[in-house]
Amino acid sequence: MIKINHLEIRFQGEQNSPYPGNGNLSNNAFLRIRAILERLGFSQRGIHGPVVHASSQIGGRDLRPAHGRGLELWLHPAGRGSGLPHPWRPALRLRAHRQPDRAPPARASEQPLRQGRRALRRRPDQRRHRPRMTAAALRLGAARIGPGLLAGLLMAVLAKLLSQSLHAPAPLLAVVLGMMLGALGLQGQLGAGLDVFAKPGLRLGVAMMGAQISWSEFAALGGPAVLASGAVVLGGLGIGALAGAALGLPLAEALIAAAACSICGASAALAASQAAPSSPENQRTTALVIVGVNLLSTVAMLAYPPIANALGLTAHQAGVFFGLSIHDVAQVAGAGASVSPEVAGTAALAKLSRILWLGPAVVLIGLMLTRTAQGGRISGLQAPPLFVWGFAALAAARGLNLIPPALVSALGACSGFLLLAGVGAISAKLGPKALLEVKPRLAILLVTLTVAVAILAYALTRIFF
């Protein structure tokens, strides 16, 4: 006879309960749980409704939240064994940990040493039972993340449509839509689905950006463009770290802002935020940086063409200057198109050369943050995140002409869509109150980085072109 040493039952609170997730059940659900407990041989004493809890008769421990998604109930037999005469599967998800009615096995240090793989295998009575993925569990998961996924999709679609009609930056509109959704106070119902876009969705979108890098097009600009863009990226990260320290900002926030200003605006900010530690403050900084770089890029789109004319730059030099200095791709194209189509093409290629450095920059940011967390030491080189490997793999595949042109366009559209949904999800989770609190030091850092990158881009344009 095998006795149940303890029993764990996970169940979900009713959605229409006044206190969802805190254990309030309908009478029908309570009767089902009590029937399960009686079937397993537990005493009826200590089982009360409509809230089920464990009293001193069956273990003395109350229900507790399981990460906000359900409850865990730990029960112990009241002085007698609770053997199962035959296999029986209840309607609710149930997991029992069983141990034989004998002394526990000796510790590993007391057991004789054995060679081979068999010594590492557990005996059947030591294996932990794992619940199977059932159709009910799949439906429950879909119901939990479905509303948030739908909200993220709608925000991305609306941001894209409004961007085309209003001629406004799509990431900025996604932030505004996310703030409007967050003002409704639906973070609890939509949080699980929004997390899908705010974490894995963002990383997948950044990885897909690698397919937009065309090595054959870079050959038209030559090696100096790659070197100049690398100098802009490294210089921007260094200036951002130093200026952020002078302003008293955390290194993670300073590097998120520096990546946005020195690489490719909102996309780089999102990629850098995935390399930084996950925290509400870093998410808030990311959203504020996206708003700031879009505003500064719009100002640069209007101001840089007359500045380039006043500085006496040729058409080719002006295109390179726009591509190396303006943050977002859309504003780079707008600034170049205001001069001539040839300048717009040159500016777009120079901008793509900065995106080429996104993967190495994310790895560098991760190393800088790891070194800071370990007190200036790096115990060992850590592997880059998976989305950086995906970015590099797609860039290499595009360079080897392994990706058809139609698939390149599809990957670009999916990447932009996932990034917009991620921006909206982050803004919706934070809410308008957190985003409307202006951080003066962060604003000063963004302006400083914009001016520094422009000066550096102008100097490199004069040197290499």
Swiss-Prot record:
Name of the protein: UPF0324 membrane protein CC_0425
Disordered, as annotated region: 97-132
InterPro entries: UPF0324_pro
Membrane topology: Multi-pass membrane protein
Ubl conjugation keyword on record: no
Keywords annotated in UniProt: Cell membrane, Membrane, Transmembrane, Transmembrane helix
Phylogenetic lineage: Bacteria, Pseudomonadati, Pseudomonadota, Alphaproteobacteria, Caulobacterales
A GO cellular component entry from the record: plasma membrane
Organism this protein belongs to: Caulobacter vibrioides (strain ATCC 19089 / CIP 103742 / CB 15)
Keyword Repressor: no
Primary location: membrane
Cellular location(s): Cell membrane
Top-level lineage group: Bacteria
Compositionally biased intervals (Basic residues): 115-132
Pfam families noted in UniProt: Cons_hypoth698 (PF03601)
Family (UniProt): Belongs to the UPF0324 family.
Transmembrane segments: 135-157, 172-194, 219-241, 251-273, 286-308, 318-340, 352-374, 378-400, 405-427, 442-464
